[in-house]
Swiss-Prot record:
Signal peptide (residue range): none
GO molecular function: methenyltetrahydrofolate cyclohydrolase activity; methylenetetrahydrofolate dehydrogenase (NADP+) activity
Homology family: Belongs to the tetrahydrofolate dehydrogenase/cyclohydrolase family.
Family matches, as InterPro entries: Aminoacid_DH-like_N_sf, NAD(P)-bd_dom_sf, THF_DH/CycHdrlase, THF_DH/CycHdrlase_cat_dom, THF_DH/CycHdrlase_CS, THF_DH/CycHdrlase_NAD-bd_dom
Entry protein name: Bifunctional protein FolD
Role, per record: Catalyzes the oxidation of 5,10-methylenetetrahydrofolate to 5,10-methenyltetrahydrofolate and then the hydrolysis of 5,10-methenyltetrahydrofolate to 10-formyltetrahydrofolate.
GO cellular component, one term: cytosol
Functional pathway: One-carbon metabolism; tetrahydrofolate interconversion
Residues that, per the record, bind NADP(+): 163-165, 188, 229
Length: 295
């Protein structure tokens, strides 16, 4: 068996198209405010991509850039001013922050109704309780990819999420539970991890350990949604060169699985697409607009 490759770029493009169609049907333009502190090169690229895709979807993008020596109070004052701005629907604080700043404290200043990353404690509580709210983007993207593989109804599927992080593992487990899946959260203390993984119809490795999941861990025909992104040495490319791999060993897993996401080009592209989707959902909830069909 050779797994079908789940192209995250293609699925993300579909989500962005649905977002653009939804925006065109709204009575106004949703607005996303992005806050970047410092000059981290990777963050600069991420923010440029987010701004570009936000505007391409027909939404308003506001970009606030603060110097690296900005104090905690100034960051939090900016967030509070964006909370109070009736034109702003979503607030994104680009991470990581420069050393000396408390990211958790800054995130907690974001109004949960504008928390398009789904990272505040209130957003986490709403997810846990099954209340309406904004969900973390990477876990949402993982569920969308699983549905693209196995169909829109995931009821009864066995899901194993490897990893219990607050950013991916726990919210992914809760989102699959909301789809009526039977969910196991595995972690570093799980006994016989390989055997646990072999029970999964949907396997979601999210631990940041390069190529940990091997083909003999995978149930034949399963969907492997690889959230991991790791940089490892690639001497075949030349001295000092590296390459990106996931938490699953792609070649061996692809021989057994029915579907598998590549790294890069799998879950990663879904994150920005789901951020745009969250911005539309936040705007509709805040402004009393009906959510357009197709989101």
């Amino acid at each position: 068996m050779t797994a079908t490759r789940l192209d995250g770029n293609a699925v993300a493009a579909d989500v962005r198209s649905a977002v653009a169609a939804a925006v065109s049907a709204l009575p106004g333009q949703p607005c996303l405010a992005v806050v970047l502190v410092g000059e981290d090169p990777a963050s600069e690229v991420y923010v440029r991509n987010k701004v570009k895709m936000t505007e391409a979807a027909g939404m308003v993008s506001i970009h606030h850039r603060l110097p690296a020596d900005t104090g905690q109070a100034e960051v939090e004052r900016l967030i509070e001013s964006l909370n109070a701005d009736p034109e702003v629907d979503g607030i994104l604080l680009q991470l990581p922050l420069p050393k000396g700043l408390d990211a958790d404290a800054a995130i907690e200043k974001i109004n949960p109704d504008k928390d398009v990353d789904g990272l505040t404690e209130v957003s986490a509580g709403r997810l846990s309780l099954g209340k309406p709210g904004l969900r973390p983007c990477t876990p949402v993207g993982s569920v969308i990819l699983a549905k693209r593989a196995l169909g829109p109804d995931l009821s009864g599927k066995n899901v194993v999420v490897i990893g219990r992080s607050i950013l991916v593992g726990k919210p992914a487990a809760l989102l699959f539970l909301a789809e009526n899946c039977t969910v196991t959260i595995a972690h570093s203390k799980t006994a016989d991890l390989a055997n646990v993984c072999r029970s999964a119809d949907i396997l979601v490795p999210a631990v940041g350990r390069p190529e940990m999941v091997r083909g003999d861990w995978v149930k034949p025909g399963a969907a492997v949604i690889d959230v991991g992104i790791n940089r490892i040495p690639a001497p075949e490319k030349g001295e000092g060169k590296t390459r990106l791999v996931g938490d699953a060993h792609y070649e061996s897993c692809a021989e057994v699985a029915g579907f598998i996401t590549p790294v890069p080009g799998g879950v990663g592209p879904m994150t920005i697409a789901c951020l745009l989707r969250n911005t539309v959902l936040a705007a509709c909830a805040r402004r009393g607009w009906t959510v357009p069909e197709g989101l």
